[in-house]
Amino acid sequence: MKQLRDRMINVRDQFYKSRRQKGFMSFWWSSPTHVVLVLEVAIANASSKSINFETIVKLLPSSMGSRSTIATVLDDFVARGYMSKDIGKDKRKRVYRVCEGSMDLINDWFTKRDFSLKAVS
């Protein structure tokens, strides 16, 4: 149980640290909807795929928020420069991409978390 306790403490501390930071990390962790939206867009980007608003709405459980909530959060990410909204192959649809700097921060977060979880295991 001590090992599980240490892991939970580590995850909690990482979460608090991310929330205290300014910029992308704090905004990313501001709600479960923010976290999941970034992950869905980042997963698509890392897979060299494009993802548009309609696809995102279909992927997210309805408990994550309404269409307007999802649109507002995505627009906030774009307005802050953490994501971009570009024209896709189908000229009628706009696709979302996580900006390179934000993707680097996500990668760093996962790398640090993986390392710290190994340290307590």
Protein language model regions, located:
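An acidic intrinsically disordered interaction segment
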Residues: 1-11
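Short alpha-helical segments that sit at the start of domains
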Residues: 11-41
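Short acidic, hydrophobic short linear motifs in intrinsically disordered regions
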Residues: 47-60
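Short amphipathic alpha-helical interaction segments
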Residues: 63-79
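A short, conserved structural fragment
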Residues: 78-88
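Short, Lys/Arg-rich nucleic-acid/phosphate-binding segment
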Residues: 87-96
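Short, amphipathic alpha-helical interaction segments positioned at domain boundaries
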Residues: 101-121
